Amino acid sequence: MWCRPAVLPPLAAVLALAAPSAAQEPTSALALAGQPVLALAGHAAVSGVLRQASGGRRRIVAERLRLPGPPMGVAADRFVYGWGCDPRGCREEGLFLAFDTARERIYLLVVEDGAPNLFVPPRTAPWPETLAEPLRAFHPALAAALRFAPAEP
């Protein structure tokens, strides 16, 4: 049975577009470096966790995943990260997404209407210090407000 894309929930539709076929699935999310952040959202190890973590904000997350941004990068040979920003700038509308390939954990920051809308993990939990520099490039003020700690092994 075929389903029109308009019938799918927004985040599910975005993830379906981003997901490569099983034959194309990279063995590691690190192989996605150089692609837009939307590719990370469609990776098998990330998509389910992202869907669950975004909860009631799935539409907002789906919209932000489509925003333009620099190619994804890799930090410490285990984190792949990227972001997308509204043409007005990341301080207005944007999304930062990172994935720790060693612990299979996502890090997500969503900005809506100039304010942070979603933090995964929560704002009070420490983020890996390896992500401090990429976060400063995405949104310096939010990076300054976060707490960073050494990445767990």
Range-by-range predicted roles:
Residues 1-3:
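N-terminal secretory signal peptides that target proteins for export/translocation
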Residues 8-18:
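Bacterial N-terminal signal peptides
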Residues 11, 109-112:
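A generic structural motif
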Residues 19-23:
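Sec/Tat signal peptide C-region and signal peptidase I cleavage site
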Residues 24-47, 114-153:
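C-terminal partner/receptor-binding element of secreted or periplasmic proteins
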Residues 51-110:
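Mature extracytoplasmic domains of secretory-pathway proteins
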